[in-house]
A protein has these predicted regions:
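Outer-membrane beta-barrel translocator/receptor signature
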Residues: 113-115, 127, 137-146, 151-229, ...
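Short, well-ordered secondary-structure micro-motifs
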Residues: 111, 190, 255-257
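Outer-membrane beta-barrel domain signature, strongest for Gram-negative TonB-dependent receptors
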Residues: 224-377
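Structural signature of outer-membrane beta-barrel domains
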Residues: 49-51, 94, 105, 167, ...
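Cleavable N-terminal targeting peptides that direct proteins into the secretory/outer-membrane pathway or into
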Residues: 1-34
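Glutamine-centric residue-chemistry signal
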Residues: 26-27, 47, 54, 149, ...
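Acidic, small-polar-rich N-terminal luminal/periplasmic segments of exported/outer-membrane proteins
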Residues: 35-173
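Short, acidic/hydrophobic/Gly-rich beta-strand patch recurrent on exposed beta strands
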Residues: 101, 207, 341
Length: 378
């Protein structure tokens, strides 16, 4: 039996804001002038058009960057911390399954389609592994749509949809921020962004994120070592036309996940399974602990299989790259907005993971996708 131990870490964060802060949601007219306290109006695009969350006739939940930072979230795998409707089953490497209200894919095979559609900056991600490692940085919001949502998002949205929406360049504004955090397990995290107004019609935004943390396990498995970059350019020659170009890159290079051997059951050919026998290993010992290897090589095999071989940290690793390019062209007409989004995304994944109860599993996976979306919204 394998148990993955999750350990919470205390985090101290420091934020330095340069210029004007970027708001994560638009506000309605300020009613405080009349002495009446008001609520912030949350704007969503869950139905492919800009509208207030209160007006959206759809079950949707939103999270802004402040909420995700305060929750100590490190990647998209941590979104379940903010929503009881969202369940995330983290497998070895980037093999992660997403469930919304209990509906999702029951396999972590990277070749299968997910039942939860995930869109990064308006671009559909064809594989869940393309979203599981997403660093949550410089985001305007994350939208969780509870399914089914096949009408707007296609057949792979039976369980629901997750939209990752980055902060976009802002015309006429020079601003930015730098945020750092330190915590247990030698955790050091940095993220920041800079918005630069090139002219009255052109603006660029550059943002990035890095995270380095020792493993929660004693053998340094369940660690983090990643960084991400994103650059955007916005061109608005007039009130009707806007063109935005974006490129992003993410890198993960660490040991990866690991489990603890907490005990064994004996399963004889005849009779019932025997009582549970504790391993005697300490919590968070990890799969490469000498005691775990002793049990692997001496207990965890049957006459039908060869004995397990010892594993060490060199047998476990993740080396993963995600790259994306996209453009978004919006043209306003008297009847509505015409939007065209061409995009290309690719991932190169080389990872090997293991647990006390099975041999190291190596995966080489290369994905690339080209998409074109044309829509008209009123």
């Amino acid at each position: 039996m394998v148990k993955v131990a999750l350990t919470a870490s205390s985090v101290t964060a420091l934020t330095l804001v340069l210029g004007l802060p970027t708001a994560s949601a638009q506000q309605a007219d300020d009613p405080t002038a009349s002495g009446i306290a008001g609520l912030e109006e949350v704007i969503v695009t869950a139905q492919r058009r800009v509208e207030s969350l209160q007006d959206a006739a759809i079950p949707v939940q939103t999270f802004d960057q402040d909420q995700m930072t305060q929750a100590g979230m490190e990647s998209a795998q941590d979104l379940a911390l903010l929503s009881p409707a969202l369940g995330i089953s983290a497998g070895g490497g980037p093999l992660t399954s997403f469930f919304v209200r209990g509906v999702g894919a029951l396999t972590v095979n990277p070749l299968t389609d997910s039942a939860i559609a995930q869109n990064y900056d308006g671009v559909y991600l064809g594989r869940s592994s393309g979203a599981a490692g997403n660093a949550l940085y410089d985001l305007e919001r994350v939208e969780l749509l509870k399914g089914p949502q096949g009408t707007l998002y296609g057949r792979n949205a039976t369980g629901g949809v997750i939209n990752y929406i980055p902060v976009k360049p802002m015309l006429g504004e020079n601003s930015g921020f730098i945020q750092g955090e330190v915590g247990d397990y030698s955790k050091v995290g940095l993220q920041g962004a800079a918005n630069i107004a090139v002219s009255d019609t052109v603006a660029i935004r550059v943002s990035g994120n890095s995270l380095d943390r020792d493993g929660y396990s004693d053998d340094d498995t369940n660690d983090q070592d990643s960084y991400s970059l994103r650059g955007q350019l916005l061109f608005e020659p007039n009130d009707k036309l806007s063109i935005r170009l974006s490129a992003d890159y993410s890198k993960v290079d660490n040991v990866g996940p690991g489990g603890d051997l907490i005990g064994t059951y004996a399963n004889p050919p005849l009779g019932e399974i025997t009582d549970f026998t504790p391993s005697g290993l300490s919590e968070n010992s990890g799969p490469t602990d000498p005691g775990a290897n002793d049990i692997r090589t001496g207990v965890l095999h049957t006459p039908s299989f060869a004995p397990f071989q010892p594993i060490d940290q060199d047998d476990l690793y993740q080396d993963i790259d995600w790259t994306g390019y996209m453009a978004e062209v919006n043209y306003q007409t008297e009847l509505g907005t015409l939007t065209f989004i061409p995009a290309y995304r690719e991932s190169d994944q080389d990872y090997q993971f293991s647990g006390p109860g099975f041999a190291p599993a190596k995966t080489l996976e290369d994905n690339d996708q080209t998409t074109f979306e044309l829509r008209f919204a009123t």
